[in-house]
Amino acid sequence: MLIIAGLGNPGAKYAGNRHNIGFMAVDAIHRRQSFSPWSKKFKAEIAEGELGGEKVLLIKPQTYMNLSGEAVGEAMRFYKLQPADLVAIYDELDLSPGKARLKTGGGHGGHNGIRSLDAHCGKEYRRLRLGIGHPGIKEMVQNHVLGDFAKADSDWLEPLLETLADNAEMLVRNEDSQLMNKIALALGGKAEEEKPRKEGKDGEKKPAGQSHIRQARSSNQPKLPATGPMAEMLKKMFGNKGE
């Protein structure tokens, strides 16, 4: 069994906040996949279903962000689960909007919801961080995270949530890097396994598999002199071959 916990604050007042992107993520999974209606248990809203043949519990703690671990920890104890059976989805200031990172364990990074999960659930669970960007000034952080997403943010927010929901089975199968690649590609980035394209002197990008020999002869190279002493010397050295 796997618990997928989205972190956020309950109530309509906070529904559109950047801090609630974890709630938005599990809501998207709930809409796209086959889950029971939301119900209340463990100081949370929960929904049961299956992904990839494995039982999955979606959970949205209703304790407010700073006490999220109370709800998730209670659910884990009820089902006798270990930290490895938990995926937490939450907002990350230090990632650009639309970026995602998934890893096991680590620190809380100043995120009080994760601090609470660490205290109640252990630390070796998987953490899916969804970037919301940093306002650039420490004093603006609270207003930033508790502010609503702008209308323009839908350009990256919708494909991010849709791609996560469409590929939620990858969380069950521990296909973490593949999921990150799916999200990156959906947001116009490149898959991590994809080799970067080489760039020539003229700034033209070429596929990684293309020969370097042709690229070494840039079209912007200066023309060789056709007349004069230098031209005569070059003809003697290389013959009268065209380029």
Curated annotation (Swiss-Prot):
The record marks D91 as: Stabilizes the basic form of H active site to accept a proton. Keywords: Cytoplasm, Hydrolase, RNA-binding, tRNA-binding. TRNA binds at Y14, Y64, N66, N112. SUPFAM superfamilies: Peptidyl-tRNA hydrolase-like. Gene3D superfamilies: Peptidyl-tRNA hydrolase (3.40.50.1470). Monomer. Its EC number is 3.1.1.29. Hydrolyzes ribosome-free peptidyl-tRNAs (with 1 or more amino acids incorporated), which drop off the ribosome during protein synthesis, or as a result of ribosome stalling. Catalyzes the release of premature peptidyl moieties from peptidyl-tRNA molecules trapped in stalled 50S ribosomal subunits, and thus maintains levels of free tRNAs and 50S ribosomes. It holds the Pfam family Pept_tRNA_hydro. InterPro entries: Pept_tRNA_hydro, Pept_tRNA_hydro_CS, Pept_tRNA_hydro_sf. The lineage of its organism: Bacteria, Pseudomonadati, Pseudomonadota, Alphaproteobacteria, Hyphomicrobiales. This is Peptidyl-tRNA hydrolase. NCBIfam families: pth. One of its GO terms (cellular component) is cytoplasm.
